[in-house]
Amino acid sequence: MLYEKFEYNINNLIGNFGLSKIAIAVSGGSDSISLLYLANIWARKNNIELFVISVDHNLRPQSKQENYYIHTISSNLNRKYYNLSFDHQNNFSNLQERAREGRYDLMTNLCLELDVLVLLTAHHEDDYVENFCLRLERNSGIFGLSSSNIHWYNNIQIIRPLYNIPKSELVEYLVNHKIKWFEDESNLSDKYRRNIIRQKLFKEENYIKAEISLQQLKTNKLIEDELKPALISAIAEAVKIFEYGFTFLDLVKFDKFLNEVKAQIINFLLIMISGQSRSARFYSIAHILKLISQDINFKNTVHGCVIKRIQNELLIYREFGKKLPKSKILLDKSVIWDNRFCITKNQKTPDCVITYLSLADYKAIKKQLDLKHLKNLSCKNHNAILFTLPIIKILEKVIAIPHISYYDNDVWNFEVSFAPNFVSRFTHFC
């Protein structure tokens, strides 16, 4: 019964991809161990190569045992196993979010190396119920309350084939087949809000969880049938994103869309322009929407961005000064800087540093800069935007600002593209 439900789910989610290989994320818990055995049956049946991936966050002594166990199972199933390691650098602030992002970075980068297009994860029905309650508690908008069984990360499709299967069925499957799993001790800690919600739900009658699941399904249907198509149309019609890392929003076209769609567009733009991975707070977005509705010019800072209304357009560019991006050494052919720009050098260029323009640097080369094009595009906000662009240095000397075609000689050649690591459950931006 369980396998038939899983098989129906995964075939519907993958569709006619014609895959020859697939990857699966396994942690050692009952959810992912069940998924591993179910996916193994399905992969053999469909002649698909299955890669098993685990990530050690180096936070619990038990993780070594878990990884060894996953390795053993993978070997017994004749599947290739990859154990990746997340370096927390002894920085424990905002650790859950950083660990999640680091985990997905590691796994999807490996998928790209293996030429794998799809990664399976073990999110099950109980996880969806918990997420809905968490987001409801945080006053999330309707897009935030929705869930998805498919999303993209680093151009890899993440699929959750256990979405409608409760944890109890997965545990029952393992018990019946005498398969061992590990319990993560941190799941019992009251330190995390999710665990408190999980404990409360455990004490409730099953019909309560069923009602939450029903509300989740209704929300998802509304998003899929009405709001998601409107969101895609709104982005296509009202948004212009420039290679300099700023955007203009046409407020006349923007005004015709529902408030839920408007809020999500503002959120998307703030994530992309700021280079951050997390969403902006809903109350911050609501404040911006209120300012827009007043039909007056304004300037505000939200989520690491400057938002400026100029008549019927909204300009958004990165805020600079409070949190400056780290310098990066360009050793290889290309590097991502500020989570927003991809800089590529030619083979003749020696190792150099990618950083931001300081006031001293600006004063030294000011007379040599041609900012006319940027000035016209940005409605005379060129000076502020200039300081958000990547510059290239060798031995503390500015040798290039590729965006404005500034080079101190004819030898250097760099290509720069605006390529934020933007992740969305509703639209896929490469």
Swiss-Prot record:
GO molecular function: ATP binding; tRNA(Ile)-lysidine synthase activity
Gene that specifies this protein: tilS
Protein name, UniProt field: tRNA(Ile)-lysidine synthase
UniProt family annotation: Belongs to the tRNA(Ile)-lysidine synthase family.
Subcellular locations according to the entry: Cytoplasm
Swiss-Prot/TrEMBL catalytic activity: cytidine(34) in tRNA(Ile2) + L-lysine + ATP = lysidine(34) in tRNA(Ile2) + AMP + diphosphate + H(+)
Keyword annotations: ATP-binding, Cytoplasm, Ligase, Nucleotide-binding, tRNA processing
UniProt-listed Enzyme Commission number(s): 6.3.4.19
